[in-house]
């Protein structure tokens, strides 16, 4: 029954594409995809479709099927009418990057499943993966929950813990791992959700923590701090490695030396000492140190 239920998938970036790919591999094919519009990317500003759109376009082309793709700039009345016409049983949301209003959440018959790459109620918000790395956590995880009008707030259907070594694992690797686990948890949860036999648990608001969206400025590391870490200041070395790992690839870690910007692409700690591995000076290609 669960595989026959109609659902719409909301998601835009790489994390969402990995989740969606896992769902498709598990036999859960969305009726439609909702993602952000195509955007100009890179120095040449080439208009590029989001990763989820690319995935669905490739799937539709190779499987002779037609998954509708909706890319609203705003979740307005016209978009809501399009969704209602699809008559979905439920929604799945993974890193959609827009606040979804009640008027949209009220459309599906069964409600909306959200997936969030943290152990809710910890690390709610825009940057859970970056934030756990920056904080030096040793455990993180992923959560499947019932979405409501508040951010990452609804009752929890399932969670899975994932051990974490922030001195080894960078953002890209952790994102991949958590997205794959999220897809697996969704595949386990959806049948129970559709059949009405899931047992969600209320989040403990007293334990809620929140994350923020990071900018380029958050990735700046004073060169004096870098120098001290290379000289053996282990506390500074660990923080710098965590910063590089958290902001790989975006917004990136960087420093300024002699008035020139240097991107810090890869580093590690050895015996409490910072070892830079890969850097990139402005106007040059990346190189090993």
Region locations from a protein language model:
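N-terminal Rossmann-like dinucleotide-binding module
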Residues: 2-44
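Short, well-ordered alpha-helical microsegments
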Residues: 16-18, 80, 100-102
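An anion-binding loop in the catalytic cleft
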Residues: 222-289
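N-terminal beta-loop-helix "entrance" segment that forms/cooperates
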Residues: 39-56
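Short acidic-hydrophobic, aromatic-tinged amphipathic segments that line or gate anion-handling sites
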Residues: 66-73
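PAPS-dependent sulfotransferase catalytic core
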Residues: 206-228
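Short amphipathic alpha-helix with an adjacent loop that forms part of the alpha/beta core around
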Residues: 76-86
């Amino acid at each position: 029954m669960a595989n026959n239920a109609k659902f719409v998938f909301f998601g835009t970036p790489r994390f969402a594409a990995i989740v969606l790919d896992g769902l498709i591999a598990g036999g859960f094919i969305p009726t439609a995809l909702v993602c952000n519009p195509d955007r100009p990317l890179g120095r040449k500003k080439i208009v590029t479709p989001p990763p989820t759109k690319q995935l669905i376009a490739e799937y539709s082309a190779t499987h002779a099927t037609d998954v509708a793709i909706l890319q609203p700039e705003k979740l307005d009345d016209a978009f809501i009418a399009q969704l209602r016409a699809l008559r979905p049983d439920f929604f799945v949301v993974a890193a959609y990057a827009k606040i979804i209003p009640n008027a949209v959440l009220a459309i599906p018959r069964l409600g909306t499943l959200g997936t969030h790459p943290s152990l809710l109620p910890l690390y709610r918000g825009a940057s859970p993966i970056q934030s756990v790395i920056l904080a030096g956590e040793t455990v993180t995880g992923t959560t499947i929950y019932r979405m409501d009008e508040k951010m990452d707030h609804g009752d929890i259907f399932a969670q899975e813990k994932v051990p974490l070594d922030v001195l080894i694992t960078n953002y890209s690797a952790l994102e991949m791992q958590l997205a794959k686990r999220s897809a697996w948890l969704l595949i386990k949860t959806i049948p129970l959700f559709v059949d009405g036999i899931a047992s969600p648990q209320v989040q403990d608001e007293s334990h809620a923590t929140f994350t923020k969206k990071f900018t380029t400025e958050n990735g700046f590391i004073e060169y004096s701090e870098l120098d001290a870490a290379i000289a053996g200041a282990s506390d500074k070395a660990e923080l710098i490695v965590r910063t590089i790992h958290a902001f790989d690839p975006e917004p990136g870690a960087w420093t300024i030396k002699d008035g020139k910007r240097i991107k810090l692409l890869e580093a590690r700690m050895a015996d409490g000492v910072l070892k830079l591995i890969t850097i990139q000076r402005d106007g040059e290609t990346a190189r090993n140190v």
